[in-house]
Amino acid sequence: MISPRFAGVLVLALTLAACNSLGAIAPPDAHIAEVESDQSGASAVNIASLSDVIQRNPNDSAAYNTRGAAYARNGRYQNAVDDFTHAVQIDPAFAAAYVNRALAYRQMHKDNLALADFNQALVANPNHAAAYLGRANLLRAQGHLPEALADLDQAIRLNPEGAQAFHARGLIYQRQGDNAHAITDFNNAIDRDPFAGAPYQARGESYIAVGKYDAAVEDFNAALNVDSHNADGWAGLGVAYEKQGNRAKAVESYGRAISIDRNNQTAREGLDRLR
């Protein structure tokens, strides 16, 4: 039998993309609740073994939660929802399963159901940091910034070592034009998870906003070291180089962005300015 709760929210990662354009928050359908995909085939093996566990222990809520997470890794969101539903039917106080189901609903663009599940998770456990974080991301995407900010404050209070809540709160401060507080939050996110690219990119955007172009170049390069196929990262690097007056590197960076995403607006506008 799988241990109770099996470490809470399993694989549905509240991954926040950096802003799509400088000073803007990603639209509601962009990187709302990403699931780590499994290219190794391990999830299929896990699903089979977890199905055996469930057959032997049909009232094991943690096994349903774990298999639901494996389904989500494979992009099988309806199967994931079904398993998370079984988990909360067996254990109505299983906050992590409500959060996981909410994240699966977000992938299915069923935001009303997702919001209801985040709320229910907090009824089950008012101190569940992941539920505050997940609800904040949804509220942020819907433009409800004060409510999202309040949820992120709670998430950080409950889990001060979590990088994602600092990153998410930094994006809200950035949207509000408070780049000083945004940079502080991005610093905290990077301190806690130095291998995530999005906080570097977001901090680079805030550095541009406050005129620290050398620091912005460093941050966009750091983001691109994590993901060199990030068109927005190349476009942001182009803006930073352009602000420095380095025309050649700006053109090169904008060109790299266009080669990845020919419709990247920041890069297209940058190339138009420099032609």
Give residue ranges: language-model regions.
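Helix-start (N-cap) detector for alpha-helical repeat units in TPR-like alpha-solenoids
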Residues: 61-62, 95-96, 129-130, 145, ...
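Terminal, low-structured helical/coil segments at or just beyond the last alpha-helical repeat
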Residues: 21-34, 41, 231-275
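Bacterial N-terminal signal peptides
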Residues: 8-17
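Structural signature of tandem alpha-helical TPR/SEL1-like repeats
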Residues: 40-49, 75-86, 107-120, 142-154, ...
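N-terminal leader/linker segments that initiate helical-solenoid repeat arrays
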Residues: 2, 16-66, 70-78, 82-85, ...
